[in-house]
């Protein structure tokens, strides 16, 4: 059993022994546990922090001297960072914890379910903040991408993206039967969305049918909002439609997550 599972079980026993904690204390305890588990997982740290830099280096070399293309790629990588830290991470982790019985044990403790998910989401938000800082700094200092012209819009769309993709990640975890099949399920959603949503290319260059499909994808609307704030200095109002789309996807994710989420391991 992995160190992360053992850490979760120790935390679960501590919660049970200490009686019902306050909601805030329980959420904070879960957040700290998630941070410890994250930093003890080198693979997670690599994909969260080094991979965006590698992508920036790759596309910076490919699009060297083509500033318009770099202005497209940097917000796209920022959007991918949000999705990877929330949707992908939660879908993987919740499936793993459910399969090993950790979620069922946590459900039997005095810790409220909302406190648990708040701690988990808070950890994902911390990763997003660090990733965006890395992408923005590298994009500005190394590749000459302009600094965000509207920081408020950047914060709003980043927060909307975190909430949206976190809810969708929790919802997807219910559909995944076991941790072995998690990569197939996650990549079946992530890879097509990444290719269609215009993350690495100007969407105007795509065929009309792909542009139509992209219009319904949450990643496309997140990248549009981030691009408006980071590259064009546009406020939230300029991309109100994208913010609404993220809100609608959040509602879908929350409904599916609440109605379908299971704390119990699947039967073989």
Question: What is each model feature region?
Answer:
Residues 29, 33-37, 104-108, 177, ...:
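Short amphipathic alpha-helical coupling elements at transmembrane boundaries
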Residues 37-66, 70-89, 188-195, 248-251:
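Hydrophobic alpha-helical transmembrane segments of multi-pass membrane transport/permease proteins
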Residues 2-14, 141, 230-233, 244-268:
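Junction motif at the cytosolic side of a transmembrane helix
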Residues 2-51:
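Aromatic- and glycine-rich beta-strand/loop motifs that create alpha-glucan
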Residues 113-187, 191, 236-247, 251-257:
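Alpha-helical transmembrane segments and their short interhelical loops
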Residues 42-43, 71, 114, 152, ...:
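Residues that define the loop-to-transmembrane-helix transition and helix capping
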Residues 65-66, 146, 197-252:
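Membrane-interfacial helix-loop-helix junctions in multi-pass membrane proteins
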Residues 54-61, 70-142, 160, 169-170:
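Hydrophobic alpha-helical transmembrane segments of multi-pass membrane transport proteins
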């Amino acid at each position: 059993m992995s160190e992360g599972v053992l850490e979760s079980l120790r935390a679960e026993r501590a919660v049970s022994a200490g009686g019902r904690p306050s909601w805030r204390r329980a959420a904070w305890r879960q957040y700290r546990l998630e941070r410890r588990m994250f930093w003890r997982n080198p693979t997670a740290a690599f994909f969260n922090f080094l991979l965006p830099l590698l992508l920036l280096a790759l596309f910076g070399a490919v699009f060297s001297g083509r500033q318009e293309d770099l202005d497209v790629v940097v917000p796209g990588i920022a959007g991918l960072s949000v999705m990877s830290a929330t949707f992908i991470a939660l879908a993987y982790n919740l499936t793993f914890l459910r399969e090993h019985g950790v979620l069922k044990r946590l459900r039997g403790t005095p810790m409220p379910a909302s406190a648990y998910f708040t701690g988990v989401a808070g950890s994902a938000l911390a990763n997003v903040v660090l990733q965006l800082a890395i992408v923005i700094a590298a994009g500005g200092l190394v590749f000459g991408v302009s600094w965000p012209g509207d920081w408020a819009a950047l914060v709003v769309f980043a927060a909307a993206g975190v909430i949206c993709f976190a809810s969708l990640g929790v919802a997807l975890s219910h559909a995944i039967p076991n941790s072995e099949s998690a990569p197939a399920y996650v990549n079946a959603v992530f890879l097509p969305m990444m290719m269609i949503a215009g993350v690495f290319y100007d969407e105007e260059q795509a065929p009309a049918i792909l542009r139509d499909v992209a219009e319904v994808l949450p990643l496309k609307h997140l990248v549009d909002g981030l691009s408006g704030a980071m590259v064009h200095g546009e406020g939230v109002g300029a991309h109100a439609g994208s913010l609404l789309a993220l809100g609608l996807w959040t509602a879908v994710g929350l409904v599916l997550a609440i109605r379908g989420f299971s704390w119990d391991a699947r039967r073989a």
